[in-house]
Amino acid sequence: MALRIEVGNEDLTMSRFALSPLWELTHALRLLAHPPDEPVLRPWLLRARDRYQALTREADIAVILALNPPGWGADFLAPVPAGVSTTIGNLLDEVRSTPAEQAHHEVAVALRRQPHMDARIRRILTGDGVAGYVATCWRPPGGRCSSLNGARCGPSSNATWCTGPGS
């Protein structure tokens, strides 16, 4: 049995060989908020648990998680990096400059998938400037870079939770 995959120009244009640090962070947060019963992840989840708890006190992690219901995630939350040298700062600039129409469309999808969302989070997500607010959530006060897990953020990445200017 042969498998044939056809790839067009648009597919190739959207292909990247660079990992998105914000995508890695989004999924690390999702794992920490709703830990799966996966033995292979248990050591990382235990190591990252305290840092995650601290982050929930420093930043509005609930807003980021609300944009990532099971089986779906808002695209503007973790833009595709232009290349391997793209910084978290570059990506946060992209998040901030998300067109309002795109952000509101993606928020609407997230809201439909979570009809019982907390009223405070719903107000934030449906308000003006949601993309800028999300960029602020990625960079809580503190002026430092720290990871959820020492040298690694996700269970298999080297992405860092950046909290300082120019990170």
Functional labels for PLM-detected ranges:
Residues 1-167:
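N-terminal, charged low-complexity regulatory/assembly segments
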